A protein has these predicted regions:
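Active-site-proximal or metal-binding-adjacent scaffold patches in catalytic folds
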Residues: 1-177, 186-222
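Walker B catalytic acidic pair
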Residues: 182
Length: 222
């Protein structure tokens, strides 16, 4: 991706600073004596950060349309956006190697292919987090299920813990918060003070991640 600079602002400052605006444009503040080559060196050094921030800002708009599955599109995994590349034939429809590689032949079913991939990764990762916290605090549960739920981030019934595949798009601490929330529900059915006290005991800063989920849940979709 070529990096387009919206504006370079010369000031008395001694260092070069990069800013990504709410409109996802790059603004640079540089010393009066910094030449273009030096500025571009700093820009290129931070290329990945710039691209990541531009994707995040672009996806932050709640009015953004569903994924189009085109080259360069950003898709979430564990709280980070990774670019999609459409490629020729490969042994599986979708690969993830620090970027998503989708076979051109799978494009007509791209959404379904991604959902199946997310489900598998979600089961592996969320099951591991459930085991970790259950063993740590002695919670007893039957099994973990990955669902297509659209409005609930977790539920529990008859000792089973249910989580939507979309949760794997969230940062790991947010996933941990939801896991802890549901584990506590195995023993505290309602959102009483005792319930929240137990959640806080397991995750003292849980409100931070609860707030993140409330604010950013609209991003966790295709």
């Amino acid at each position: 991706m070529d990096i387009e600079i919206e504006k370079i602002i010369r000031t008395k400052r001694k260092t070069i600073a990069l800013y990504i605006t709410d409109g996802a444009t790059l603004i640079i503040k540089a010393p009066f004596n910094a030449n273009d080559k030096t500025i571009m060196g700093v820009v290129l050094k931070h290329k990945k950060w710039i691209e990541q921030k531009k994707i995040e800002i672009g996806e932050r708009d709640p009015k953004f349309s569903p994924k189009e599955f085109v080259n360069g599109e950003g898709l979430l995994h564990l709280g980070r956006y990774y670019r999609l590349k459409i490629v020729g034939d490969q042994e599986v429809p979708l690969k993830f190697e620090n970027e998503f590689y989708l076979s051109r032949n799978a494009l007509p079913q791209a959404k379904e292919v991604f959902i199946e991939w997310y489900k598998k990764i979600a089961y592996d990762k969320i099951s591991e987090r459930v085991r970790r916290y259950a063993q740590k605090r002695g919670f007893k549960y039957n099994m973990v299920k990955i669902t297509n739920a659209q409005k609930r981030w977790g539920s529990s019934s008859n000792g089973n813990l249910n989580f939507p595949w979309r949760l794997i798009m969230a940062p790991l601490p947010v996933i941990d918060y939801v896991v802890i929330h549901e584990l506590v529900h195995l023993e505290e059915k309602n959102h009483t003070k005792a319930f929240w006290d137990r959640v806080k005991m397991l995750m003292p800063n849980y409100e931070k991640y609860k707030g993140w989920l409330k604010k950013n849940s609209y991003l966790l979709r295709l």
